Amino acid sequence: MESGDITVRSNLVKYTFRNSSTLILRQGQLLDKIGHAKEIFYTYSQGVYETTIILSNSAEEYVETCFRGEQLVSKAPNLASITVKLPEENSNCSGLYYYIFKKIAWEGINLLEVVSTTNEFTLIVSQDDIDKAFSVVKRLNIA
């Protein structure tokens, strides 16, 4: 991916589980099952009290099996993602995320989750909002 590249994925599902002493083991089991499949979208975020997994709905059965017995807080199907590759100097750019989120909010798009690494960010939205969200992101000119 080059700076400014945009990747859109659809048919995603989000699971949020209450943290437990066994949850990280369950994640390992899931990764054993899906780790070889390059076409599967997967992101994992662990907070203080909850853990969220967002992945392709084609892997739902693995989540249902691997995380059986864990406390499910919520499940949200019919999601989509937009991933943007940022310039390497983005870490030194004050207000970058404010600028992006403001534009998204002005269009009335509900951001369900935001996932980021050093040089890319991923917005998770309802599949119903993906076209509008893509249009907004495409116009941002953040390359």
What is each model feature region?
Residues 1-143:
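A conserved regulatory-domain signal marking ACT and ACT-like small-molecule sensing domains
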